[in-house]
Structure formats: structure tokens, C-alpha cells
Swiss-Prot record:
Residues 662-684 are annotated as: Disordered. The keyword Cell membrane applies. Residues 770-1053 form the Protein kinase domain. The chain crosses the membrane at residues 631-651. This is LRR receptor-like serine/threonine-protein kinase GHR1. It catalyses: L-seryl-[protein] + ATP = O-phospho-L-seryl-[protein] + ADP + H(+); L-threonyl-[protein] + ATP = O-phospho-L-threonyl-[protein] + ADP + H(+).
Amino acid sequence: MNLSRILLLSMFFLSAMGQLPSQDIMALLEFKKGIKHDPTGFVLNSWNDESIDFNGCPSSWNGIVCNGGNVAGVVLDNLGLTADADFSLFSNLTKLVKLSMSNNSLSGVLPNDLGSFKSLQFLDLSDNLFSSSLPKEIGRSVSLRNLSLSGNNFSGEIPESMGGLISLQSLDMSSNSLSGPLPKSLTRLNDLLYLNLSSNGFTGKMPRGFELISSLEVLDLHGNSIDGNLDGEFFLLTNASYVDISGNRLVTTSGKLLPGVSESIKHLNLSHNQLEGSLTSGFQLFQNLKVLDLSYNMLSGELPGFNYVYDLEVLKLSNNRFSGSLPNNLLKGDSLLLTTLDLSGNNLSGPVSSIMSTTLHTLDLSSNSLTGELPLLTGGCVLLDLSNNQFEGNLTRWSKWENIEYLDLSQNHFTGSFPDATPQLLRANHLNLSYNKLTGSLPERIPTHYPKLRVLDISSNSLEGPIPGALLSMPTLEEIHLQNNGMTGNIGPLPSSGSRIRLLDLSHNRFDGDLPGVFGSLTNLQVLNLAANNLSGSLPSSMNDIVSLSSLDVSQNHFTGPLPSNLSSNIMAFNVSYNDLSGTVPENLKNFPPPSFYPGNSKLVLPAGSPGSSASEASKNKSTNKLVKVVIIVSCAVALIILILVAILLFCICKSRRREERSITGKETNRRAQTIPSGSGGGMVVSAEDLVASRKGSSSEILSPDEKLAVATGFSPSKTSNLSWSPGSGDSFPADQQLARLDVRSPDRLVGELHFLDDSIKLTPEELSRAPAEVLGRSSHGTSYRATLDNGVFLTVKWLREGVAKQRKEFAKEVKKFSNIRHPNVVTLRGYYWGPTQHEKLILSDYISPGSLASFLYDRPGRKGPPLAWTQRLKIAVDVARGLNYLHFDRAVPHGNLKATNILLDGAELNARVADYCLHRLMTQAGTVEQILDAGILGYRAPELAASRKPLPSFKSDVYAFGVILLEILTGRCAGDVITGEQEGVDLTDWVRLRVAEGRGAECFDSVLTQEMGSDPVTEKGMKEVLGIALRCIRSVSERPGIKTIYEDLSSI
């Protein structure tokens, strides 16, 4: 009996012990404590010590997988968790096989004891916010089969110990900030099936030995800085089926690209490198491939015949230097399975025969030198781009084309009228015939012949006659481009409702009459351009109903009456000048600069106190009242004298208070109008910074309270305006002057998280708080400081304005991509700070001295040094083009904010480096729109960006901005200055175009350069060549060359 009692007690005791928290449970509960945010409650509502199984494993907890009494798996993917993760806790889970927490907002570092996870086979921490370097002990995790750390901010080199992961089958470390050479030890991972190290900053040569990994199926190294020669042995011997080494710096030394390609490779991408030579005439390079992408290289010669190539499905050879004719085999219907063919951006010539292939869906032959008439047949083509060639003839051949949905024939030499015969393009949704020589009128049956049309562009031809009656009422149309023709008649009729039209451009035609009163029915309209017509009457009040309108231009017409009282608050571009409008400008339009309203509109009045109202009055009455000019000039002179007297008074006061201090003069940017020569005549130049300041208001309206206090310490170049033209990054201040600090309230004010993109800087938030910080300037997205660290190192700190930055996770993922950007002509970003409040977002980058291009170029008070010589200016232009070429082709990102103040000159040699790049990727849509709007006011915005409600920077908009900068370099003038004189209020680009069109292009050059040009014919030739390049850069987007071409052309001068 006693023995039975003992047994029962023992069983009860063991049962009770089973309910005690195990080592596994304690580790999980400790991890739970680090979770700051769990939007779904998946973890916080489930993990508790009251729901534990009898065997001691919490299998009822969400995301937990048990094996017996032990935790075997923790799966917390895609939950939006925010946590400071301590992964060393999981070393206590001795039977853990799978740990997966991808796509959250987890931060922290990998533990040094990662190698003690003896049973771990699957580790996925991708798409989080982890940082720091990889621990050397990671190579001791010999049981790991799958390791994914992609989409984080890991930095430093991959440790050689990675070669110890002998069981590894899949390794993904893409989209991090890893750098250094690829370790040779990776080639010893004999079981590896998948290797992805793309979008990092790896340098050096690709190690030999990857071809010896017999199991390797996928090798992805794209988006790094790997250099050296293509390894022909790898391509011949590898067993991989997918190879992507695009976006690196690989070169070739022999005349042939490769001696051959392994039969196992099906997908090969070597685009965006520096490969030269020609393609082999044999078929061994292509016979087993399904996808081949060699675009954006420097390959040349004629294309091979592509005989006996049966498996190729995608062939991309765009933007190289191929010449000769187009191989007919590529367009046959019986020799290839080709679905996509892109040969654009080469030097191919000759005609294009009929396209017989029934499998070819996408054919891009744009930007070549192809001639002849259109092909008779297009086979199964759905997308056909033949733009920017030398095709001629009429358009009647397309009557037999059946499957086309996207057709671009722009920038050719087509003549005749728009076909009226019934075509087969019933599926067409995009039709671009711009920049040809088409004549006649548009047929009335367009809506029935093209029932699915969304985009119609027939701009820049010689069309006549009215708009077809039902065209504007087509239910599918979203964009209509009819500008730059000779069309006549009234505009209309318009649909009463249901219109999808987002863009309507009828500018530079001969339309007349009144606007339809039902204009407000175009409720989706975002861009409306009716400029340079003969329209009259009043602007219909129904325009107030177009709430999505972001760009409105009705200038150069004969409109009368008042402006609509309540136009859309989304309008970012506005121009009603050269009309006969009257009344008072509505309050919601008063912040647009005077050139939006004047010249013309002599009876139109800006509200009292509106920015620039005095300037507008001067402009409005200029042609009829010369007395006003005199008054303005005298007023400016008096104001200037007063400013000088005030400056002298302040100087005396400062000197009396602190004799040892030197007066800081010349620090305030001149905000007044300046009189400079305009060609052969004088003229007034209105600074674009004034327009930005007018639109923004005072600095207090855009700065956080902390920034206001920093500015108030005396380092703001202006306390009355939002500065968009800063004096440059090289401004210096007396050492004994009281410096502004980032910690304007207390030394420990920065209490958030400071992340660095590499290991070159070690700094805490508190140390950054203590750093003296001089204000360099302000822009639409924040304030820039020069911070002096304790070790004497300078950093540029950009304090982002409240509300412009994206959410933390997206911001962090984007900013870490910058760590891969390393180039002598690009300013290096070092890190970022994320504070606990909305206005505490900082970006840290290298400080560049002596200053910006603007501070050396413009003839303004405080200009640094003597005027730049031609050799210096040309070198700066080449440097900037080289930096942009790197961003576009090596990093595949547009700059997005290119202007003279963002080109910094480094050292005594004035090496140019572009700064403030890719900020649009860190900002909200509103922040991006505001940045682009400022670029428009300052003269750098590409015209196409005004045609989008949600504009985003692009490669082509960068080229436009670079063209404007070239004009600044040539003229010495600021892009945003409004130049008046012989012409009425034109900006820099229009002024240069006018001079060139009149055969007076040489009058545009800076007087300093003109003196050099007169004594050196080589200089004169170079300046004229750069002027030609600049004019190409500011063409319409479809005619604009890529930066690669521009860089090569500039380098050859």
C-alpha cells in the first residue's frame, strides 16, 4: 500500500513538473519582451505561460512548431512586428530546426554565438532592419541548409568562415550593404544550389571556382562593383542554369565576348557592364539560351545571323554600338521561339522586311538609323517601337497589322495624312506618331477604328482642321497630345460625364472660340495645356470641379474676365500670362510667381501682401509705363544703401561687444533683383530663389522648433526666406564664434537610433548631439549642417523636415541601398539617424569643401574665388556626367534632385561630386512633389514631370537637369533667373534657344569665356560643342539622349 502511494505521488510530481516553464519557453517569453509593436496581436495575444502542453512545449502558441517536448520551429513571417531582437536567446532552443521572421521591422545584430545553433537548418531574417557586420562564428553553423539575410543593412565583408557551412544549399544576402571582395571560401560550398549576393557593394574580381560547384543552379551577383575580365572558363564549365552578373564593371580584353557558353545556362544577363568586342559569328553562344541580355555595354560590329538558334526566347542587345543591317532570321516565323527582341539604341541601318514571326510579341528597334517604309506585316507583335529612326513613306501599310496594342512611330519622316481606311488596329491602346511630317486633318472615325485607345500622341506634325467630333468623348482615352500642329476650330464637344482623360495638350495650334462650359466634366483631368492658341471668352467656372488638376497652362490666348474662384488645390504648375484677364487673383493661386500671371493681364491684380506683388506690378506695366522702371531702380538702390548702412551698424555693434570677433559679412544671399547684360541689351534678372522664398514663406514656417533655435544662433544665411540657393558646403566660421549644436536643448537630446552604412565611422547619438554644427543652407526637404566631430572629422548632416520622410521600415530599406554607392564623383552617404519624434530624421554624408558649383559660378556677392576658366568648367561637366552615368547604369537609380547647389567641388582641383541624390526614394509622395516643384521654380524640372499628378524623377529628367546645368556653366547665369530685355521675361533655357535660333548663340557665353574664346579657337570649338550637347539634353523626353551618350560626347571634347 505504501508503495502504491509512493508511485502515485511520483506521477503527480512528474506531471506537475511538466507544467513548469521549460528552457525553450523561457527563451521565447524573453524574446516576446523585446516586441514593441504587434499590429495583429499574433504573438502578444498568444504567447503566455498559461497555454503550455503537458509535455512542456507551447504548440498552441502562434508560429511555434513542436517536436515532442521541444520547440522545433519559430515562424513569424509577414506580421509587421517591430522589435529589438536578441537572437542569442534562441541558442537555448537546442532542438530548433527552423527560424523564420522575414518581412518585419526587426532590428539588432546577429549574435556571435550563432555557431552554437547546432540543429538549425533554416534561418530566414530577410526584409528587416538588421545591421552590423556578419559574425565570424557564422561558419560554425554546419547544419544550416538555407540562409537568407536579404533586404537588411548588414555591412562589412563576408567572413571567410562562411566556407564552413558545408550543408548549405541556399544563400541569399542580396540588398544589403556588404562590401569588399567575394571570399574564395564560397566556392567550397559544394552542395550550394542557389547563391544571391546581388545589390551590395562587392568589389574586386569574381573568384575562380564557382564553376566547380556542380550543384549550383542560380548565381545572381547583379548590382555590385565587381570588376576584371569576364571569366570564360566559368561560362564554359558551370552547371548553373541562371546567371546574372549585370550592373557591375566587367570588361573584355579579346575581340570576342566569350569563347562559348555552357549548355546548362538558360538565362544569362551581363547587361550594364563595360563589355567590348563583337558577338561571335558562330551559334554556340546562343544555341541553348532562352534569355540573353547584353544591353548597355559597348559591344560593336555586325550582329550574327542567328542561324540554328531554336530555343532563344528573349534577346536584349539595346544601347550598344552594333551596326549593319537587321538579321532577317530574327523576324522569321519558322526559326525562333523569340518572344522579346530589343535592339534599340544602336547604329543599325537598312530596311525592316516583313515580320513573319508569330511568337514575337515585343519588338523594340527604336533609336537606330533604320530606313525605308514600314514593314508590310508585323506577325504576332503586340508591342512595336520603331521610334527615332529614319523611316519614311505613309502609314497605309499598317492596314494589315492585326495584333498591335502598343505602337510608337515617333521621330521619323512619315508623310501623308492619318489613314482613314478601316485598319486592323482594334486592339491598339497606345499610339504615338509625334515628330513626323503628317499633314491633313484627323479622320472622324478614329473612335470607331481604335476603340481601345488610351494614349494618342500626334504632336509636332503639320496637321490641320478640327478635332474629330467624338474624339474627346471616347470612354477609353486617358492622354491626348495634339500640340505643335496647325489645327483649327473650336474645342469640343466634351462628354457630360465618365471621361477618363488625365492629360489634354492642345497647345501651339490655332484653335479659337470659347471653352465649353462643361469643362468640369473632365473630372480626372490632371494636366491641361491650351497655350498659344486663339481662344477667347472667359475661363468656365466649371473648372473649379476638376479637383485632380495639377498643371494648367492657358497662356498666350485672348481670355477675358476673372479667374475661376476655386481651382484645384493640387495645382503645382500654373500659367495664364499673355491674356486679358481681370479682377483679383484668388487666394489659392496667390503664391504662384508673377510670371504665372504677367506679362499681359493688365487688369489682373494680386491680393495685397502677396509674394512678389510689387514685382508683378512692374512687369505688368513695363511696356506702357517706363516711369515705373525708374521708380523700381531707384527703390532698389535706396534699399541697397539702407542694407549697407544696417550692415555697417551691425558690424560696429558686434565689434564693440566682442572685439576679437571678425565681422561676418557677405553671408547673406542677395535676394534683390540684379541688372546684368542680356545679349546685346540690358535687362533685369529676377532671382529664382526669391520665387521659392515667396512660395514657401519664412523659414519659421518650414523648420521644426529645434531647427528654429539652431538657425537663431546666427548661422542661417537668411532668416526671412526659405533658402533654396545655399552658399555651398564650404562656408567657414570663426573658431571663437558660438556654434549651433544639434543638441539645442541638452547634450543627450538625440536619443534615437544612429545607423551607419559602413564601418568607417564610429559614433553615438550623444556624441553627434555634442558636435558643433554650422548651418549650410535649407531646401524643400530640410536643413543642412556641417557637424564637427570630436576627432576633427567633418560630416554633412541633413535634418529632414517633418512630414517628408517615409515610414521607418521603408525609409531604412531604401537608405541602406545607398551604401553600395561608391564613386569619386558621387558624395558618399555614411548613415542616418531615426529619432523618437517626427522631426528627428537625419541623413549623414561626407562633407565636401570648398563649396558648391553655384558658389563658384554665379556672379553674385560672396562668390568664391575668381571666375572659373573654361578648362575648369569642362572638367566639372565631365565629372558630373561621369557621376550620373554611374548612378544610372551601375546603380540603376536616377539622381532626382540635380542642381548647381548639389554639385560640390572637392579640394584644390575642384573635382565635381554630385550630392543629395535619390532623396525621392526616402520621401513621401508629397515631399517628392514639393522637391520637383522647387526644381521647376529654380529652372531644373523637366517638362514631362509637370504632366503627372504623382511625378517621379527619371533618368531622362536627370538628363534635362544636367542640360540646364551645362547652360549655367556656359553662361554663368542661374537657371531660375527670369531674363528680361529684348524678350519679355524668359528663363535661361528659352533665352538660349532664342539666341541660337537667331544665329547668335555665341552671345550666350559668359563674358569671361568669351575672352578666352577670342584667343583660342580650340576653346571656341569646345564651347560650341558643349552648347550643342546642352540643347540636346533639354529636348522633349522622347528626343533626349541618355547620359551614357552625353558622357561619351563630353569626354571626347
